[in-house]
């Protein structure tokens, strides 16, 4: 956390080259993405066979998908990251808020986020 604050202060100060600033922004984005993944894992938990049609860390099976309800943590992690990246891309037009909206959509569903008052 202290590192992110330091990086943010350096960005604001303008004392870094554009290339360095771009690298810092990428690092901060990765850190936020990892934090979102950790939060989803903590609050969703790893779903087992009794949670059908949900597998992994809350992935809802779509028609034609053949994911096992007994997937490993590594497989579940990869599926979560893939889903979250797709949702981030869906909300890309919202800039810095795309990860926040993607995390919310992962939890409540994309349709509910799009119909929500927060999107007005």
Predicted features by range, described:
Residues 3-120:
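Cell-wall polysaccharide-cleaving catalytic domain and substrate-binding groove, primarily
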